[in-house]
Amino acid sequence: MTSKKKLINFSDRIFIAGAAGLVGSSLKKLFIEKGYGKIDKRGIILSPSRKELDLTNSLEVENWFKKNNPDVVVIAAAKVGGIIANSHNPVNFLLENLKIQNNIIESSWNNGVRRLLFLGSSCIYPKESIQPIKEEYLLNNSLEKTNEAYAIAKITGLKLCEYLRRQYKFDAFSLMPSNLYGPGDNYNLQNSHVLPALIYKFHKASITNQRELTCWGTGKPLREFLFVNDLANACIFALENWDFEKDIFPTDNNKNKLSWINIGSKEEITIFDLAKKIAKLTNYTGIINWDQSKPDGTFRKKLDISNATYLGWESKTTLDQGLKITYQNFLKNYSTKKLKK
């Protein structure tokens, strides 16, 4: 179910916060491919670097908005990381993410932005949740402790958008994607997510002929992985088509219409089977050990994406296809020493 008229225009000034990151870079490329940001159509894609705009500085962000006057804003900027990084640096994860999103959302509201999209994460949902996870399950139970700080920040951003929409009719909404991966990911073993960490670990073991390697946990947890280009497609699709006033969505316990939807691939895999896939992809033939003294994180996180399906969106990239593309990009950057680490 989509609107007949697109809700964003080729002539819009579109600000992508975090345009150099995994999601932002894919999103910027797709916006341009679809015809946005072209001078002959009076549009522009605004994608300042960290040096050009410190998103944690509220005064700097407010001044940038007054000078550049964006019509559409996508918040793809965030401090992200895996279990190790989240567990060791909860203060940094909470403070930095709160600053980034609060500064952008408030300046968007102050300066007449017409449409704002905030990107969250599936980690906002309770650790012990009914599966698949519906949007209305938010705050029904306690969070996973290993990434609680990041989750709290994302919940705050989601709720700020919801309250601004409800109280001031500000057109802000959110998408909650499942576990992301793709070209341009972070491969630092100390702060990366599980999939890129496994790619790096297995590739290194393969080229150095290691006889065995060790992965964290039991390998039993299930994960739903979403290729980053599919999320970029979902972002633009939602910006163009999600008419909040016309489309019907579930309500919370107070009968308020929800202002976020889940985005996922509907494809689940255990970490054990993911490791086997990546071992095959990287030509690793040694033994895979599992260190069960390390945390698994949430056992299962499968999102219910029926609302996205209702809007007319679905993912296009299978896990096997996405892994192949991601590894090819990894090899290209590994050989030229351009990996994000």
Language-model segments: residues:
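Flexible, glycine-rich beta-alpha linker
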Residues: 124-126, 149, 173-197, 221-222
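NAD(P)H cofactor-binding loop motif with strongest signal on the N-terminal glycine-rich segment
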Residues: 19
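NAD(P)H-binding glycine-rich loop region in Rossmannoid oxidoreductase-like domains
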Residues: 58-98, 110
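Adenosine-cofactor binding site in Rossmann-like domains, unifying the SAM/SAH pocket
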Residues: 34-63
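Short-chain dehydrogenase/reductase
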Residues: 94, 98, 146-158, 188-196, ...
